[in-house]
Amino acid sequence: MKMAEEKKGFFKRLVNGLTKTRDNIVAGFDSIFSGYSSIDEEFYEELEEILIMGDIGINATSAIIEKLKEQVSEQHIKNPAECKQLLIDGIKDQMRVDSTEYAFENQKSVILVIGVNGVGKTTSVGKLAGKLKDQGKKVILAAADTFRAAAGEQLAQWANRAGVDLIGGQAGADPASIVYDAVAAAKARNADVLICDTAGRLHNKKNLMEELRKIYRILEREYPEAYLETLVVLDGTTGQNALAQAKQFAEVANVNGIILTKLDGTAKGGIAVAIQSELDIPVKYIGVGEQIDDLQKFDADAFVNALFDVDEKDLGTEE
């Protein structure tokens, strides 16, 4: 019951947080569905324009519209209003990805968290630590983003809030050596999850690749029994830039999932559709606020429902 209540509460926040995106997309749709008396090429072009403006991305949009055209033709649909549910289902289909498991919840794990400055990376690490701690896990944080002076202090505050141990080093210290120390601590203290806050200097890809390679090597050598998850943090307010960043990180790291932050108050929430559709990398968590519990597991169907403000009456039926 508590789970259902929490989920309902989060869905409500998601609906509120996506207000700008919804105004951007849905208001346009409604005027098209009510403003057109027949389905023609102009009708499709208008829909396409709204999807692209909502940051759903050109490729995903083309696929959604093509599928809609096929269905309209097959089902001999004449009334534009009948396209709305088909469109919602089409967006959900575009967001299907191969794997959305949270394998790190069920075994000894290391989670590497990467992302450029300013996306809310360190905050996300802190919130994720709190989330896993609430699940009864022993969590250790590693402050391996030594490039940004304030990152360590910020992470220390989050570790304090979440009630978890933190392994850090001096500003400018070698991130790989901090990860090495953190692995030793994780093993000695029998931690379930070690979360490493690592730098993400995309403008210097060569250095970033080297740094990540070193970290991966240490983890393989020192902690081969741990499952490794790499999460990229992206700022939802940056729209297509976030997609470009995700692509670049996927080139240098084995990315298992995305944390999409700052979705409250952005008109670019459609980027979640573009990421899953184009990269086949699941968005695993989304942030819609500043509180420690404002990082929640991502549910693509609930997200699209919130985008269209579809009533989630049966929200409490699943975990």
Regions found by a protein language model. Give the residues of each.
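Non-catalytic terminal/linker segments enriched in charged/polar, low-complexity residues
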Residues: 1-100, 106-113, 128-130, 134, ...
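P-loop/Walker A NTP-binding module and the surrounding RecA-like catalytic core of P-loop NTPases
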Residues: 92-95, 100-319
